[in-house]
Regions:
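Active-site-proximal or metal-binding-adjacent scaffold patches in catalytic folds
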Residues: 1-97, 106-135
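Walker B catalytic acidic pair
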Residues: 102
């Protein structure tokens, strides 16, 4: 069960969570917790998906931010992947697809047939996931 309750109380000094409940002084603390947990999850999935690639691609740095028109960006020159923080609202498979998509740009620089073949090696359901992310 992934649901939890948030309890705001001015008497609390630090955030605490147990038994599917988050106890916090204010919503700012809750936002910080969500950001911290998002960073952990995204980095963990980046490491996992990076290891799927047999090619010698560089391990990129990770930036997470809210983007209005993209789910991810690959900057090959800076060896950086930027992920949209809103991906945390989607199933893990969607996050993995976006990471695989961006890592595939280290192998193929465009959206050629070879690029999509690369993506499909690691994310066979990518077409369905793309549909989910467009809705």
């Amino acid at each position: 069960d992934n649901e939890f309750s948030i309890i705001i109380s001015n008497s609390l000094n630090e955030i605490d969570y147990k038994n599917h409940k988050v106890y916090a002084k204010d919503l700012k603390q809750v936002d910080k917790l969500i950001k911290k947990e998002t960073e952990k999850i995204f980095l963990s999935r980046l490491e996992y998906n990076y290891n799927l690639f047999q090619e010698k691609i560089p391990f990129p740095s990770l930036t997470i931010r809210k983007m209005s028109t993209r789910w991810g960006v690959c900057n090959r020159k800076l060896k950086r992947v930027t992920l949209n923080s809103l991906l945390i609202r989607y199933p893990l498979e969607a996050l993995d697809y976006v990471i695989i998509h961006e890592l595939s740009h280290f192998v193929h620089f465009d959206h050629s047939k070879a690029f999509w073949t690369e993506v499909s090696k690691y994310s066979p359901r990518y077409k369905e996931i793309r549909k989910l992310l467009k809705d």
